[in-house]
Amino acid sequence: MSYKFETLQLHVGQEQADPATDSRAVPIYQTTSYVFHNSQHAADRFGLRDAGNIYGRLTNSTQDVLEKRIAALEGGVAALAVASGAAAISYTIEALAANGGHIVAQKTIYGGSANLLEHTLPGLGITTTFVDAHDLSAVEGAIQENTRAIYIETLGNPNSDIPDIDAIAAIAHKHNLPLVVDNTFGTPYLIRPIEHGADIVVHSATKFIGGHGTTLGGIIVDSGKYDWKKIGKFPGIAAPNPSYHGISFADAVGPAAFVTYIRAILLRDTGATISPFNAFLLLQGVETLSLRLDRHIYNTKKVIEYLSKHPKVEKVNHPSLKDHPDHALYERYFPNGGASIFTFEIKGGVKEAFKFIDNLKIFSLLANVADVKSLVIHPATTTHSQLTEEELLAAGIKNTTIRLSIGTEHVDDLIADLDQAFNA
């Protein structure tokens, strides 16, 4: 039987009560290790011939439910939960491009991801070319002989610009490259990138998946559609791996080879493991994902209407507005709405921006987004402060740019708070 999203977000991974305790809620399996039935059972687990828990750094039964649920919601074959979104992105890029690989990346991405690609990963031999994702010829033109993936976000950070995922997927696959899509801001409730050609989907589960500003976590989802053996560019996944008994992950586990490789090699060796408690908290968030997103979207629409008419606002950067350059893409990829994280330009300069932010009462000034509580920040001096002036302008960030993350409070109270801050 096929179930709707709202049912899947509650039940996948635990279709029946916990067999050991009859608990209907997913238990927190707070353990480091697991008893094997006998020596052969242990050998089969380590040889990947029998799926199941080996050691807490790699797997946990609470974590397993979270992974199965997100994989189902995204339409993937398997997922891996890790300690943070940064870990999910780092592992994904390292698995694809280690030892001299190259990435083509959308230039308007989260500042932390941009910093990882531009400054940290070159020390590991991984280079990146940043491109305007709207210029498809630039995307294709940036591909080199050693390119190993194209990397984009469903909704850019902080301005919610939207790439044409279908078109970029076609370019990636024309050159036998996997397309990696960060769907943190989109969420599988609003858009499923795998349906548009993505091969790998990553999330900072800290954001909408958790939804309450309490829990760090990251997710990597494997579409199962990329043929790692046929292409020949990824020997760590397809060829016999010397650090894991000579196993070819593509042969041993088939479509789930990518996330299995990361779990068995990168997670094993570097240990960005999600805790059972954090996996449990993220599951609580998943169970209300659709309900929260509906309210986020409703509130965002009302706030945008207010800001668009305010005399102290120079411009609102939201793809739902008809004058936004990505409006057509927004209607195509987000028919049910989206983008509750967006920016606007306040008239004046940085002084006016700081004054407005510092006078808000309900909106919290902090670096997180996608919380049930409404949030605000000045990107140029915080989240994107590592970027040069040229890089900030390329990312569409000015000294007058203010980022809002619209929560689920009553929208009348949010608008009243914005209004008093403008008038302070």
Give the location of each predicted region.
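PLP-dependent enzyme catalytic core of the Aspartate aminotransferase-like
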Residues: E118, T127, E145, R292, ...
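Conserved PLP-enzyme active-site core in the AAT-like
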Residues: G13-A17, A79-H310
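Well-ordered beta-strand positions enriched in small/hydrophobic/aromatic, beta-favoring residues
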Residues: I150, G218-I220, V316, F342, ...
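Active-site beta-loop-alpha junctions enriched in small/polar residues
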Residues: L155, T184-G186, L321, K347, ...
